[in-house]
Amino acid sequence: MLIFVERVRGKEMVNFNNNYDELAMPGDWIPIVQKLQSQDGTVIVLGKSDSGKTSLIKLLTYFLVKRNRNIGIIDLDIGQSTLGPPATIAMSTVDKKKLKDGNIPIEHMLFIGMISPVGCIDRFLDRICKLYSISQKKKIDTLIVDTTGLVMGSIGIYLKSSLINRINPAALVALQSAQELEPILSQFESRPSLQIYRIKPCQNIVQRSWRDRKLRREKQFCHYFRDSRTREVDFTTTTIRDFNFGLSFCSDNDIVDTIKQKFALEPVYAEKIQNTVVLILQEPQSIPGKDIFINIKKHLQVEQVISIFPHWFQYFLISFNTADGFSNGLGIIKNIDFEKKKITIYMPGSISAENFSEIELGQVRVKPDGTELPYNEPVKF
């Protein structure tokens, strides 16, 4: 089931247009859902990919809203999102009117910039807490949290355990076919304030391949950027946060001049970030030999030099953020002119210059037609 994110009058909307009365609930889910009817607080739903987490949440939402409960939903599944576009986490509230209309406005969205938590766990957890804090200010009886399918191995266990410890939910609903979630659940068995419900995954859930998941994301991106236009942003007047190297987009002219004079290179941008120098070379200049970069490292007394060209940034997904860090929507880099200090961006028509105060540059590459592109590792010396 694919839920497209719509933009209505400048707001993100989730197309929740389904006939719930025709949905069948597996028998062993019914008693759990009935118990959750009187469960105040936060409910985290855990399960590996294709275990039925989203289906359970949709059924649970329908069941509780019909019984006059005020429901909040937080979607943390950045690779297979249902509220916001991929690479984001988002929150909505649901009542009878919204459920009847079939469109649920996204009230808050945060950019993660990746489609897997691996490689950005700290950022992921910090932003989950930020979104959760906002949810606690709303009039919600039950907050339901959808999670990623990353539950196995040391990373999956650490991620889910950290999530539970930070949010401190009232209940966990664990969809497991065997004992795959026990390394997580066993850590919380003795917590008296936490209810743990173990249920079997739905047998009717279609198992999706990696390609199926990629195609689903591409459809979401294509739909999201279907009416995109281009605009230029002056990055001398806009704060830019880069998740790739930590670039500030404020070039160090002293380093640029030094490299031009001593090493006969023509960088259009240079910045020292901790013990690394990032050089952006003028195109179509070819990458010089390794020896030059070894000498640059010695001269600048750094551990690493990264060399890229401006076109390396093409098609990176970005977020237009408000002053408090929430996302007002996504865009795609078309090109960057470091000499003119301009970024040309594909952006949805609903986003205006007044709607954002900073740009975050993610680690996902996608074309406006939705096609996902591989991440090109930069040249490092």
What are the residue ranges of the model-derived segments?
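Hydrophobic positions on the alpha1 helix immediately C-terminal to the Walker A/P-loop
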Residues: 56, 60
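Preference for solvent-exposed, low-hydrophobicity sequence contexts
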Residues: 1-41, 45, 69, 170-381
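The conserved Walker
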Residues: 49
